[in-house]
Amino acid sequence: MEEIKVYNTLTGEKTVFRPLVSGEVKIYVCGVTPYNHSHIGNARPAVTWDVICRYLKHIGYKVEFVQNFTDVDDKIINKANAEGSDWKTISDRYIDAYFQVMDAMHVRRADVYPRVSDHMQDIIDMVQGLIDKGHAYVLGNDVYYDISTFEHYGALSGRKIDDMLAGARIEVNEGKRNPGDFALWKGAKPGEPFWESPWGKGRPGWHIECSAMSVHYLGKTFDFHGGGSDLIFPHHENEIAQSEGCTGCKFVNYWLHNGFITINSEKMSKSLNNFFLAKDVLEEYSGDALRYFLLSVQYRNPLDYSRDRLDEAEKNMERLSGVIGRLKELAAKEGAEKTDASRSLEKAAEESLKAFHEAMDDDFNTGLATGAMFDLAKAINIYGTAVDGGLSVDHESVEKAYTALKTIMDILGILEEVWEKTDSPDDKSYNDLMDVILAVRQTARKEKMYKIADEIRDRLDAAGIVIEDTPTGARWKRRGV
C-alpha cells in the first residue's frame, strides 16, 4: 500500500502512518451534541473524515469508522426544559436534521453512530475501573478523575497542569483534590434525566462518554482519533487519561485535528453567535459547493467563511459539471487516432492522478488534491476544443481521462449525482439522437430557415437541453449538468 504521512497532534510531527493491523484502519471521531441544527463548522470534520475514509478504502484499506452522538448533555437538557419537552425528543430531532445535512453533502454513513444513552453500562464500568485503579474518587454522588495520578496528563495539548484551567469545561466543586480534576459521573439534579449507578442516581460527565464508546467498538488501542482542534483540551486530553488509566494500554496512535471555520479570522461558534447553520447555507448553495468549500484547504488550516468563496465554489461546480458533460460527449464519439493532443490528454490524466495521490498521501491535503482535479479538467477542455476544430477523437485517451477524473471526484465526493446521470446505459443512443437533431438544425440554418432552427432550439430548451452555438458548431448539454 501507499505510504501516507499524517500530522500527529500528540507528537507535533508529521510521521508515516503504520496501522495496528496490516490492511486495516480503525477510526473514532467525536460527533455533535444534538441540541440545535449544525453549523458549517460542525460539518467540516464530517466532510474531512468522509474523504479520508474514501481515500483509505480506495488504496486498499479495510476501514472501521465510528462517530458518536452526545445525546445526554447540559445543552440538550436546557433546550428540553425550555421547550417543555424531553431530552430524547430534542436529540432525535437534531440527529435527524444532522443526517439531512450530511446527505445533502454526500457524506457517507459511518459504520456505527453510538449514542451516550445506549452505553450507560459501558460508561459505569469504566468509571468503576478508574476508581478501582486509584485514578478516580467519589465525592458525594459525584465521581472525579484525579489528574495527579496520570503521569502523562497534558502531553496531547502541551500544557502543564497549573495552566490548564483557562477556558476549560471543568466542574466546580470545593471538595476536589485538584482544581483540574474533572467529573466522570455527576449526581442527579432536579429536572434532569438520570441513570442508576453504584454512586447513586446521575449521569456521565462529558469526557468519559467518548472513552467508553470508542473502546467498546474499536478496542483498547486504535489507529486514528479525530475532531476539531477545540477538542484537544480538555476533551481529548481527558479521554487519554481515562482510557489509558482504565486499560493500561496506549489509547490512540494518531491524533488528527481539523482547523476552525472562521469569520473575519474569528472562530465560528454558537457561543459567539457568529455562526451559519448548514441547513441555511444549503438553501442558497448546492451541497457540492459547500462540500468543495470545506475541502478547498488542507484540513488542519483555518478556513475563512465568506459568500464570495461560496459563490466561487458554486461556479467551480458548474464548470466541473460542464467538463463531465464534455467528457460524455467525447466518450460517445468513435475514433482511435493517436495525436499530439490525445497524448497530451493521457499525460494530463496520469499526472493529475499522481498529483492527487501525492497530495492525499501528504496528510490528506485536499487543497492540493482539488488543484489536481482542476488541472485535469482544464486539459479535458483543451482537448475538447481541439476536437471541435476537427481533430479525430482517440477513445482510449478519453477513457483514461474519464477514469482519472471520476476516480478523483469519487474520492472527494463531488458531483456524484452528475456522474450518475452521465453513466446511464442509454447515453450512446441519446447522444446519437442529439447529433441527428443538431445536424438537422444546422442544415436549417444553412438554408436560412431560421424559424425552424429557432423552434428546434426552443423545444429542446423546454425539454431541459441547452444548445450552445460556437464558431466550430453547435454543442448541447442537459440543463444543470
How should these model regions be labeled?
Residues 267, 276-481:
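Structural preference for alpha-helix termini/caps and helix-kink/transition segments
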